[in-house]
């Protein structure tokens, strides 16, 4: 199962995504659920890299994209850029929610603000 866990710390202007696991919907290379989950993580990583290039982050983001274990964490430089970064994370979170809705046996999402 793919588990996508979103985190935020508004007081520190931080947002994060940790994606772990494999869907197992089909054989490697033919697993549309895994491919969908992966492209969402890669899309977020690219957007966060572009935020860094625009000077919107306080520090370089932590981006690790590995098969079965990806982490994307960043800290915005101010409230305005935090709103932009958070919006990007929320769009990606919506994608994972759609995957979990359509493939609940393969994808789970821990959303921003959701109790553990």
Where are each of the predicted segments found?
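Short, conserved glycine- and acidic-residue-centered signature motifs
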Residues: 33, 37
């Amino acid at each position: 199962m793919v588990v996508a866990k979103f985190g935020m710390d508004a007081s520190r202007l931080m947002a994060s995504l940790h994606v772990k696991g494999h869907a197992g919907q089909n054989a490697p290379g033919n697993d549309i659920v895994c491919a969908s989950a992966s492209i969402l993580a890669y899309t977020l990583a690219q957007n966060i890299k572009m935020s860094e290039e625009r000077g919107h982050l306080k520090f370089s983001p932590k981006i690790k994209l590995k098969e079965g274990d990806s982490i994307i964490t960043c800290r915005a430089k101010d409230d305005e850029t935090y709103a932009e970064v958070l919006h990007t994370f929320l769009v990606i979170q919506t994608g994972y929610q759609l995957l979990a809705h359509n493939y609940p046996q393969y994808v789970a999402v821990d959303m921003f603000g959701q109790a553990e």
